[in-house]
Amino acid sequence: MNKLRTSKYLQVIPREKDYAIYHSLFGNLCLLDFDGYNLLRVFDKACSSNEVLKSFSKYDPILLIHFINTLLSKGFLTIDGFDEYVLIEEDYQRCKKHFHSGYLIRALQLVMTNKCNRSCEYCFVKTMYNSDERAILEQSPKNVNMSFETASIAVERLIEILRKNGNRELYIEFFGGEPLLNWQVIKSVLETFKNQANGVTLHYSITTNGSLMIPEMADIFKKYNVTVTMSIDPLDLKEQTACRKGNGRLAQVIRILKEAGNWVTFNSVISEETMDEFDGYTLVEKAKDYNVTMIGLILDLDLAFYGSDNKREAALQKLWETYSFGRQKGIAVVGYWYQIFQQIIGKQATRFSSGYKTCPATGCKLSIEPEGHVFICKCCSTYIGHITDLDMVLHSPQYEAYALKAYYNAPECKGCEVEGFCSGVCMGALEKKYNKIDTIESGTCTIYKKITRKLIENIRTHEILTLPLVQHERKQLHVCG
C-alpha cells in the first residue's frame, strides 16, 4: 500500500475553534476540528492508512477511511514522493504550443477615447507608462477617438479567435479616457453586434465617471445588458459628485441608470493621493443609499506607494474596514486582492478554466487603442502590434511572455502561500518600475498575503466546507438491565 504524507503546499491558519487549511496551488479551503487536524498531522511522517487506523481505533474505520480519502482528494495529502507542481508543468507543456491560437483570450478592452472631461489626480495614465510607443501614441492626434471601423474590426477578429478555439463568450469593456465622450461609436457597436454574434455571447461593461450620462445612454445600456461601473472619487463623496472637478451629481446619474433598470457598480481607489480622504464607511453608505450592491476597490498602481510600512498598513486597514462594513450592509467589496481568496475557497474559477488568476493581462485580454494599436492592457507599456494583423500579435514574443504568466509567476513566488492564485502586482506597474514583468514588488505581496489571511481567519463556518472528525467516533451500544 502506498504511503501518504501531508503536501508541502499545505497551508494552515489556526482559528479560535478550528483550523483553516488549503493547498497553495489548488485551494480547496476547508475547516478541520482539532481531532481532524491532529489526524492530518500524523501524515507529516509518511505512513499508510492502515497505520493511522490503528492509532485512531476509537473512530469508525469506514468513516475514518472516508475522511482520509477526502483529505487526499483535496490535495492536503499526497502519495509520498510526489510533487504536485508537476501537474502545473504538465498543463503548461500541453497548452503552451497553443498560446498563438489565442485560446486564453476571453476579454476585449476597447479604448474608445484617450480624452477625459475630468482631471482626477490619481489617474494612472498620467504616470504609468515607460515605452516610446506609449509616449508617441499619447501625443498622437490620430489616437484620440476610436472609429466604428476600428472597433468593428477588433470585435470581429476576437469573435473569430474565440470560435476557432471553441470558446463561446467574449467580454467587451468600453474604456478610456472617458468613454462616453465617444458615445455614438459605443452605441453603434452595441446595435451592430448586440449580445450574440456568430454563435458567441457578448457581455459588455463600461467604466465611466458618469458625468455625461443621459437617459438615452441608460436605455441603450439596459437593452444590451451593459454593466455600468462608476468611478467614484473619494475626495468628493460627501458632495456626491462623480469626479473631483465634475459638475454632474452622483445621485442624478444613479437615478438615470436605475430608472432604466441598469446593473451599476462602484469603483474607487486607495492611493497616495486619496489615502487621507478615503472614507470606506461613506462609500458603502452611498452604495446602500443608491441600491448599488458591489464596490470594486483598486490599490495604488504606483509601486513607490508600497515601500513604506506605514502606508501599507494604512491601506490594509482601510481595505479591511471597507470590506467589513460592506458585509454588514450587504454590499460586496471586491478587487484583485479579493480574487485570491475567492479562488482559494473555490467560488471563482482558477486559471485552468478562466485562464488567469488575478490579472487578465496574462494573455487573456487585448486592449485596443483608438488607432487600432494593441497592448495587453491599458495599464501596460509593451507594444504588441496592430489589430489588423492579429496573427502577428498572437505570435509575438511579447504576447507569449504575458501568456506565460497565466501559468508561472516570478521565481521569487515559488513557495508563496498564495502562489496558485495570485498573478502578482499589475503588469503595467512592474513594467514602469523594472521594465519587465518577471519579478515581484514585495510590498504589494505583503498586502495581498495579509488581506488573504485576514479573510480566511474571519470566514464563517457556514460559508465553507467543514470536515469534523469528532462526529465520526465509533458509537457505543449501551445495554440496560
Language-model features: locations:
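Radical SAM/AdoMet-radical enzyme domain recognition
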Residues: 148-175, 182-302, 307
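Short, small/polar residue-rich loop motifs at catalytic or cofactor-binding pockets
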Residues: 16, 359-363
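Cysteine-cluster motifs in flexible loop/terminal segments that predominantly coordinate metals
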Residues: 407-454
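Canonical Radical SAM [4Fe-4S] cluster-binding loop centered on the CxxxCxxC motif
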Residues: 102-149
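C-terminal accessory region of radical SAM enzymes
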Residues: 315-348, 374-423
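Short Fe-S-cluster ligation motifs
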Residues: 153-173, 440-481
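Long, charge-rich, low-complexity alpha-helical segments
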Residues: 31-109, 149
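Acidic, low-complexity/disordered tracts enriched in E/D and polar residues
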Residues: 1-42, 478
